[in-house]
Amino acid sequence: MPRSRINGNFIDKTFSIVANILLRIIPTTSGEKEAFTYYRDGISAQSEGNYAEALQNYYEAMRLEIDPYDRSYILYNIGLIHTSNGEHTKALEYYFRALERNSFLPQAFNNMAVICHYRGEQAIRQGDSEIAEAWFDQAAEYWKQAIALTPGNYIEAHNWLKITRRFE
């Protein structure tokens, strides 16, 4: 039984009902419908912290999905899971791949910046200020891109950019 039919969360149930209605109304191929079902089940598993199950669903959705825009969100969610698991290199790879397909994903730029900032803090703890500055500079570039896409969001990042004199 698909995960979306067994989930007890009200929001997930509502999303599933609306998604099922849309899938019936909007003309889509059976492959697109199946890809969306895997994507939806991946979201459900991810929201419950079942990352292995979510990844299986996302990989299957990627195999079936042909639309680059839709694939970008699948890739983004795979990146989120790798971020949550502390697999930052893999996460960055998936965020990059998502942005290749959809350059309007400010949340991907933000997450990439957070990872770079974290690596900068790690470098400081290890006593390597030169490497830390390089990571912080990279974080700044990603945050600038996120802010450019959605002005008014990422206020903490905006403040950090001003405080560290990285905002142009």
UniProtKB/Swiss-Prot annotation:
From which domain of life does this come?
Eukaryota
Q: Which PROSITE patterns match?
A: TPR, TPR_REGION
What are the start and end residues of each TPR repeat?
A: 35-68, 72-105, 120-153
Entry GO terms, CC: chloroplast thylakoid membrane
Keywords attached to this Swiss-Prot or TrEMBL record, sorted alphabetically, are: Chloroplast, Membrane, Photosynthesis, Plastid, Repeat, Thylakoid, TPR repeat
Q: How does it sit in the membrane?
A: Peripheral membrane protein
Question: What's a BP term from Gene Ontology annotated to this protein?
Answer: photosynthesis
Q: Where does this protein reside within or beyond the cell? A: Plastid, Chloroplast thylakoid membrane
Q: Which HAMAP family match?
A: Ycf3
The task this protein performs is described as: Essential for the assembly of the photosystem I (PSI) complex. May act as a chaperone-like factor to guide the assembly of the PSI subunits.
What family does the entry list?
A: Belongs to the Ycf3 family.
Q: What is this protein called?
A: Photosystem I assembly protein Ycf3
UniProt organism field: Jasminum nudiflorum
Q: Which gene encodes it?
A: ycf3
